[in-house]
Amino acid sequence: MLQAGAPTAGSFRTGEVHTGTTIMAVEFDGGVVVGSDSRVSAGAAVVNRVFDKLSPLHQRIYCALSGSAADAQAIADMAAYQLELHGLELEEPPLVLAAANIVKNISYKYREDLLAHLMVAGWDQHEGGQVYGTMGGMLIRQPFAIGGSGSTYIYGYVDAAYKPGMTPEECRRFTTDAITLAMNRDGSSGGVIYLVTITADGVDHRVILGDELPKFYDE
């Protein structure tokens, strides 16, 4: 998230740390792909080039973080704790919808105090792969979702490039291309791309390094 106003001398040292960012999640038959860039900024300074913005909430449920880094991580930690207790009560893995509801409730309860948006995605045995947006305390399931400051540059691309029934590899490519395009345009997005693929078989983590990112015309 970009800070309002032009940077000042003090903002290079004291600006709030933001995961001003590009996050994305895509459903496929049997799972989901979640991706993010890795740049974290404070004011006009980049304070972390390789921060992993994909935070686990449970074994097969992840959230993608954007907004204030501290606020987003606080919500993720609270949600993970509540979800763990929920799973113990059920004596079975919790649903992705339950995780999304927990994140939604926390986000809405502290909407005046916390500046963060978490996207929840994962797999469960009842609904398979699922993606939920929770911005501002809402809850909506989507076949794919994007968020963060970089998302404003790629709405047209993802609307045109998405097609139902994509394979896991096609979803990873779709996510990588979209985040790369956002990183090229958004000064608050950059670094490497983290990808997590979640299925019934488990969780697959991948990192796309800078020299492995796809090349586009503007480069």
UniProtKB/Swiss-Prot annotation:
<comment type="function">
    <text>The proteasome is a multicatalytic proteinase complex which is characterized by its ability to cleave peptides with Arg, Phe, Tyr, Leu, and Glu adjacent to the leaving group at neutral or slightly basic pH. The proteasome has an ATP-dependent proteolytic activity. This subunit is involved in antigen processing to generate class I binding peptides.</text>
</comment>
<dbReference type="GO" id="GO:0019882">
    <property type="term" value="P:antigen processing and presentation"/>
</dbReference>
<dbReference type="GO" id="GO:0000502">
    <property type="term" value="C:proteasome complex"/>
</dbReference>
<feature type="active site" description="Nucleophile">
    <location>
        <position position="21"/>
    </location>
</feature>
<dbReference type="GO" id="GO:0098586">
    <property type="term" value="P:cellular response to virus"/>
</dbReference>
<keyword id="KW-0539">Nucleus</keyword>
<dbReference type="GO" id="GO:0048536">
    <property type="term" value="P:spleen development"/>
</dbReference>
<feature type="propeptide" description="Removed in mature form">
    <location>
        <begin position="1"/>
        <end position="20"/>
    </location>
</feature>
<keyword id="KW-0647">Proteasome</keyword>
<dbReference type="GO" id="GO:0005829">
    <property type="term" value="C:cytosol"/>
</dbReference>
<feature type="modified residue" description="N6-acetyllysine">
    <location>
        <position position="109"/>
    </location>
</feature>
<dbReference type="GO" id="GO:0009617">
    <property type="term" value="P:response to bacterium"/>
</dbReference>
<keyword id="KW-0391">Immunity</keyword>
<dbReference type="InterPro" id="IPR023333">
    <property type="entry name" value="Proteasome_suB-type"/>
</dbReference>
<dbReference type="GO" id="GO:0004175">
    <property type="term" value="F:endopeptidase activity"/>
</dbReference>
<dbReference type="GO" id="GO:0043161">
    <property type="term" value="P:proteasome-mediated ubiquitin-dependent protein catabolic process"/>
</dbReference>
<dbReference type="InterPro" id="IPR000243">
    <property type="entry name" value="Pept_T1A_subB"/>
</dbReference>
<dbReference type="GO" id="GO:0014889">
    <property type="term" value="P:muscle atrophy"/>
</dbReference>
<dbReference type="GO" id="GO:0070628">
    <property type="term" value="F:proteasome binding"/>
</dbReference>
<dbReference type="GO" id="GO:0005634">
    <property type="term" value="C:nucleus"/>
</dbReference>
<dbReference type="GO" id="GO:0004298">
    <property type="term" value="F:threonine-type endopeptidase activity"/>
</dbReference>
<feature type="modified residue" description="N6-acetyllysine">
    <location>
        <position position="53"/>
    </location>
</feature>
<comment type="similarity">
    <text>Belongs to the peptidase T1B family.</text>
</comment>
<comment type="subunit">
    <text>The 26S proteasome consists of a 20S proteasome core and two 19S regulatory subunits. The 20S proteasome core is composed of 28 subunits that are arranged in four stacked rings, resulting in a barrel-shaped structure. The two end rings are each formed by seven alpha subunits, and the two central rings are each formed by seven beta subunits. The catalytic chamber with the active sites is on the inside of the barrel. Component of the immunoproteasome, where it displaces the equivalent housekeeping subunit PSMB6.</text>
</comment>
<dbReference type="GO" id="GO:0071257">
    <property type="term" value="P:cellular response to electrical stimulus"/>
</dbReference>
<dbReference type="InterPro" id="IPR029055">
    <property type="entry name" value="Ntn_hydrolases_N"/>
</dbReference>
<dbReference type="GO" id="GO:0019774">
    <property type="term" value="C:proteasome core complex, beta-subunit complex"/>
</dbReference>
<keyword id="KW-0865">Zymogen</keyword>
<dbReference type="GO" id="GO:0001889">
    <property type="term" value="P:liver development"/>
</dbReference>
<dbReference type="GO" id="GO:0009410">
    <property type="term" value="P:response to xenobiotic stimulus"/>
</dbReference>
<keyword id="KW-0963">Cytoplasm</keyword>
<dbReference type="InterPro" id="IPR001353">
    <property type="entry name" value="Proteasome_sua/b"/>
</dbReference>
<keyword id="KW-0888">Threonine protease</keyword>
<dbReference type="GO" id="GO:0048538">
    <property type="term" value="P:thymus development"/>
</dbReference>
<keyword id="KW-0007">Acetylation</keyword>
<keyword id="KW-0378">Hydrolase</keyword>
<keyword id="KW-0645">Protease</keyword>
<dbReference type="GO" id="GO:1990111">
    <property type="term" value="C:spermatoproteasome complex"/>
</dbReference>
<dbReference type="GO" id="GO:0071347">
    <property type="term" value="P:cellular response to interleukin-1"/>
</dbReference>
<protein>
    <recommendedName>
        <fullName>Proteasome subunit beta type-9</fullName>
        <ecNumber>3.4.25.1</ecNumber>
    </recommendedName>
</protein>
<dbReference type="Pfam" id="PF00227">
    <property type="entry name" value="Proteasome"/>
</dbReference>
<dbReference type="InterPro" id="IPR016050">
    <property type="entry name" value="Proteasome_bsu_CS"/>
</dbReference>
